[in-house]
Amino acid sequence: MGLSWTVPLEWGKNHSTTNPLGFFPDHQLDPAFRANTRNPDWDHNPNKDHWTEANKVGVGAFGPGFTPPHGGLLGWSPQAQGMLKTLPADPPPASTNRQSGRQPTPITPPLRDTHPQAMQWNSTTFHQALQDPRVRGLYFPAGGSSSGTVNPVPTTVSLISSIFSRTGDPAPNMEGITSGFLGPLLVLQAGFFLLTKILTIPQSLDSWWTSLNFLGGAPVCLGQNSQSPTSNHSPTSCPPICPGYRWMCLRRFIIFLFILLLCLIFLLVLLGYQGMLPVCPLIPGSSTTITGPCRTCTTLAQGTSMFPSCCCSKPSDGNCTCIPIPSSWAFGKFLWEWASARFSWLSLLVPFVQWFAGLSPTVWLSVIWMMWYWGPSLYNILSPFIPLLPIFFCLWVYI
């Protein structure tokens, strides 16, 4: 049974759609070649539609090997046409246009073409330029010395080495310069640290002083009244409008005087240890001592090479007697004699001191135990004076 059918004329009127029938891939309905007539000149049409997708083999609604490009007889839906297997399109050919991508780095032209002025400099012209004082100042500063003439050399390497090989002042020792700056900086930092700690001594002692008036309670300023009402604050930080401000200043002034007295005592002890104070102890067998500047001793004392000796004058043929004694003991005796001359009641304490010095070891152990028991409290009291210890140590070593 054969199938015969003709193409309706209405299909040929659709000039905007190429190949409307779907099975003439190499022909096009063109009005110029009688496309709307019954006998179109298909073969003589030069504008053929080369539809490569129509020649591809696929599975569609019309069976294997034929895929209508504009829908099958059952419609446009995928269900009507069956399973469509989309084949990927061929990738475009690789472009041979090098202008579209990164351009290769061009070959560097020779130096004679890019910098012709550089080719004018050779060893002779360079040495001639070095004779100019302005140019020589760049290579030979005023601090160094060099020869008056520069001998030409054949190679550039030896030329540069001859320019920078100076015979003059040596290079500065950077290690010595660094250590010279580092020492004062460390001393300045340590001094600033000690100063900040020393400035806290008056406030700490002021807090301890005021705490004696508030045993078992928090210190509160008692200078508040109705005339100058202030908020609750510590007596060690009274504002100027508080009546307790003047008492706070008085306490700190007394504390500063106490610190200065302590430093003065330490200085006197240090001078006495160095043998710079004309203090002489009582010579055994004599009741009087002549104080004055030490004179040259005719007889050297035993064991006085490391420690100073006190030289006391005696009217014995104009010679002086040197006695090796602890300088601290001499200084203590000097202070005791000075205080006893002005305060006669201190002489009453001499028997007590002698008795205390002759106590048994049991009493000394008891004293040590009490110091151990009261040690933490004593540390809290003496802790503000700890920053003074490095200063005292430095003075003791370097004076």
UniProtKB/Swiss-Prot annotation:
Tree of life domain: Viruses
Keywords attached to this entry: Acetylation, Caveolin-mediated endocytosis of virus by host, Fusion of virus membrane with host endosomal membrane, Fusion of virus membrane with host membrane, Glycoprotein, Host-virus interaction, Lipoprotein, Membrane, Myristate, Transmembrane, Transmembrane helix, Viral attachment to host cell, Viral envelope protein, Viral penetration into host cytoplasm, Virion, Virus endocytosis by host, Virus entry into host cell
> Entry's InterPro entries?
HBV_HBSAG (IPR000349)
Which residue ranges are recorded for the region named Pre-S1?
Answer: 2-118
> Region (Disordered): which ranges?
84-109
Name the principal localization, coarsely classed.
virion
Q: Where is the composition biased (Polar residues)?
A: 95-105
Q: Which residues lie on this side of the membrane: Virion surface?
A: 2-180, 274-347, 398-399
Residue positions the entry lists as glycosylated: 319
Q: What segment(s) does the record annotate as region Pre-S?
A: 2-173
Query: What is the entry's stated biotechnological use?
Result: Systematic vaccination of individuals at risk of exposure to the virus has been the main method of controlling the morbidity and mortality associated with hepatitis B. The first hepatitis B vaccine was manufactured by the purification and inactivation of HBsAg obtained from the plasma of chronic hepatitis B virus carriers. The vaccine is now produced by recombinant DNA techniques and expression of the S isoform in yeast cells. The pre-S region do not seem to induce strong enough antigenic response.
Does this UniProt record's set of keywords contain tRNA processing?
Answer: no
- Spell out the post-translational modification annotation for this entry: Isoform M is N-terminally acetylated by host at a ratio of 90%, and N-glycosylated by host at the pre-S2 region.
Q: Where is this region: Pre-S2?
A: 119-173
- Where in the cell is the protein located? Virion membrane
Q: Which GO terms describe its cellular component?
A: membrane; viral envelope; virion membrane
Please give the start and end residues of each transmembrane region. 181-201, 253-273, 348-368, 375-397
**Topological domains annotated Intravirion:** 2-252, 202-252, 369-374
> Which Gene Ontology BP terms does the record give?
caveolin-mediated endocytosis of virus by host cell; fusion of virus membrane with host endosome membrane; virion attachment to host cell
Is the keyword Acetylation assigned to this protein?
Answer: yes
User: What are the lipidation residues for N-myristoyl glycine?
Assistant: 2
Q: What is known of its domains?
A: The large envelope protein is synthesized with the pre-S region at the cytosolic side of the endoplasmic reticulum and, hence will be within the virion after budding. Therefore the pre-S region is not N-glycosylated. Later a post-translational translocation of N-terminal pre-S and TM1 domains occur in about 50% of proteins at the virion surface. These molecules change their topology by an unknown mechanism, resulting in exposure of pre-S region at virion surface.
Function of the protein:
The large envelope protein exists in two topological conformations, one which is termed 'external' or Le-HBsAg and the other 'internal' or Li-HBsAg. In its external conformation the protein attaches the virus to cell receptors and thereby initiating infection. This interaction determines the species specificity and liver tropism. This attachment induces virion internalization predominantly through caveolin-mediated endocytosis. The large envelope protein also assures fusion between virion membrane and endosomal membrane. The middle envelope protein plays an important role in the budding of the virion. It is involved in the induction of budding in a nucleocapsid independent way. In this process the majority of envelope proteins bud to form subviral lipoprotein particles of 22 nm of diameter that do not contain a nucleocapsid.
Report the sequence similarity comment from the record. Answer: Belongs to the orthohepadnavirus major surface antigen family.
Protein name as catalogued: Large envelope protein
Origin organism is Hepatitis B virus genotype E (isolate Cote d'Ivoire/ABI-212/2003) (HBV-E)
What gene does this protein come from? S
